[in-house]
Amino acid sequence: MREFSRGSEWRRWDLHVHTPGTNKNDQYEGSAIDDRWNNFYKSILDYIGDGSDKSKSIVSIGVTDYLSIENYKRVINEKRLPESIKLVIPNVELRMTPMSRNEGINIHFLFNPAIVDDLEDCFFSQLSFEYNSRRYSATRTQLISLGKALDSTLDEDAAYSKGVAQFIPSLDSLRNLFSNDPKLRENTIIIVSNSSNDGVTGAANIFSHIGGNSSDFDATRQSIYQFVDAIFSGNPSDALYFLGEKSDSPDEVIRKCGSLKPCFHGCDAHTNSKLFEPDNQRYCWIKSDPSFNGLKQVLYEPKDRVRISPLMPEEKSNYHVIDSMVIDDPDFSPEPILFNDKLSCIIGGKSTGKSILLHNLALTIDKKQVEEKIEKSKTKTRILTKVKVFWKDGEVNETGAVNNSHKIVYIPQTYLNQLSDENEEKTEIDAIIEEIIMQNDNARTGHEQMLKDIQDYKPSLDKRIYDAVRINTELLNIKNEMAEIGPRSGIEKQLDSLKKQKDTQSKELSISEEDISKYDTAISELTKLKAQLR
């Protein structure tokens, strides 16, 4: 079985760890160098423990030093790190111009461990710094020479330290080195600090402080970002910016920086107490296999494969995660099949057992559901005699056992087709889709808010509907009354006819207008009196 059979998983990495004997600022505990190394390893063991605490289980470290990989080699040769640390990467740190505060900009070169033996020739001897018209490389001998050129009274160790401190190459010299060696570039991940102290931001601040216009530094800043692969920063604002999710769009970040960039972060430990403990618990989580190629994959998917957070990203409850399954059948391997807690895909050619595997996995967990869906989909799949499914919470499902303590959704082949053929307004497809959508926090929150809004507006809406129905009823009654009375035109014609009859009869009976008026008044008075008597 492969060592990392589950695929990419979130694990803690710390790519910026100095060791005892580091070329600058060694503050590890112990009077002698061997004592400091012993205390260093003990601190690591104490921190990681048995590895059960995921927030303290470090899978990869970048052994960091200024212009040297000697301490990296010592760590590899001594083999005293916990077994949980699967990958150790050489991280060469140096300063480059332009200046950031009192030093150059902090830049790191993380090398593929496979090319460590080549670095003396292809990297250290090719680095270039000029002092007093003489070119110096970054080999130990040349750094000692540089130190002595600066102060001839120094012994070799002191001269070496002096040379390391003063060796500050230019961005152009570094760019040329890697441009001339494609193999070296392919096996190197270059990371620059964005700190306001020793990073690109610090250099920009210095430029402004000495009277320059900050925009005049843009070309230099962008040249640095275009040269590197990633950023060393625990600042959430930096992480958003270099993903194109802040002041600049993704296209604009790519234009300025060459690509979207991941932000890594490390403890930058120079003391025992600082090991694996960056400020504010800004731990670096990376989703990949602990390998150099796994780390390189982050460069292509920076948004999905790295997080700076105190807690593991996307962590699920153990009772929601299938850990593995074991099949006891002569046609299958007896080795456990391990699952990723995010996404597992069953890949294979036709008739290689994909449906059998999925069917028996579901059948072992929820037999009733599987049998009902198989009946509807009209499919037949081979049933294996003995299967065990192991959950991350320790629960075990076995073939034939009735156990519905864990919920799954099983969708056999042709099942959705069968549901689609049903002439019903709502089918199980709707429930399946809704359940999947509701797994998204934003969708679920929006749905819950919508239901709340409906509940809040319902009384007002009900009243408006009632009023509309009442008014409509009144209108219908009025229309019915009008229909019984008759149309307006007919009534007007009838009035005209009655008026004509009145005029005719008045003439025939010699009734004067005054008599008619008195008669109308009497009728009106009589009507009033009858109303009063009632």
Predicted regions and their residues:
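Flexible, acidic/histidine-containing loops and adjacent segments that form or flank the divalent-metal
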Residues: 93-168
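Phosphate-binding glycine-rich loops of NTP-binding sites
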Residues: 61-62, 113, 340-373
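Short beta-strand-centered segment that lines the nucleotide-binding/catalytic pocket of NTP-utilizing
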Residues: 368-384
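Nucleotide-cofactor and metal-assisted catalytic machinery
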Residues: 65
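P-loop NTPase motor core
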Residues: 379-455
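Charged catalytic cores and adjacent phosphate/nucleic-acid-binding surfaces used
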Residues: 1-57, 70-89, 94-126, 195-351
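Long, non-membrane, amphipathic alpha-helices that form coiled-coils
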Residues: 440-534
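Hydrophobic, aromatic-enriched interface-forming segments
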Residues: 143-213
